[in-house]
């Protein structure tokens, strides 16, 4: 999926490019792309580190969204097909 398509699908309003939902969707696309890359190149340690960084950023954004707007958080994780955060 292209970046523009993701932004259009998850934007809150027409000129929205940086809302939490859009950021999470873009990071999820990067996670999927990097995961596919690492299946073929499992010793690419720089990409593994990058994947862990992206996952951490996405986790922080999801945590923020779950506290700020739980309804849109639930909708977003179901739409993206990702697991909910563990409650500690």
Swiss-Prot record:
One MF term in the entry's GO annotations: structural constituent of ribosome
GO biological processes: translation
Gene3D superfamilies linked: 6.10.250.3130, S15/NS1, RNA-binding
Superkingdom of the source species: Eukaryota
Main localization category: plastid
Subcellular location: Plastid, Chloroplast
Keywords: Chloroplast, Plastid, Ribonucleoprotein, Ribosomal protein
Gene Ontology, cellular component aspect: chloroplast; cytosolic small ribosomal subunit
SUPFAM superfamilies registered for this protein in UniProt: S15/NS1 RNA-binding domain
CDD domains in UniProt: Ribosomal_S15p_S13e (cd00353)
InterPro entries: Ribosomal_uS15 (IPR000589), Ribosomal_uS15_bac-type (IPR005290), uS15_NS1_RNA-bd_sf (IPR009068)
Pfam family, one: Ribosomal_S15
Subunit: Part of the 30S ribosomal subunit.
Record family assignment: Belongs to the universal ribosomal protein uS15 family.
Annotated protein name in UniProt: Small ribosomal subunit protein uS15c
């Amino acid at each position: 999926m292209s970046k523009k398509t993701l932004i259009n699908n998850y934007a809150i309003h027409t000129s929205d490019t940086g809302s939490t939902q859009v950021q999470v969707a873009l990071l999820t696309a990067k996670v999927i792309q990097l995961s596919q890359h690492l299946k073929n190149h499992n010793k690419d340690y720089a990409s593994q580190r990058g994947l862990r960084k992206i996952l951490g950023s996405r986790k922080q954004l999801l945590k923020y969204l779950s506290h700020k707007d739980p309804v849109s958080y639930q909708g977003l994780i179901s739409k993206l097909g990702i697991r909910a955060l563990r409650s500690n």
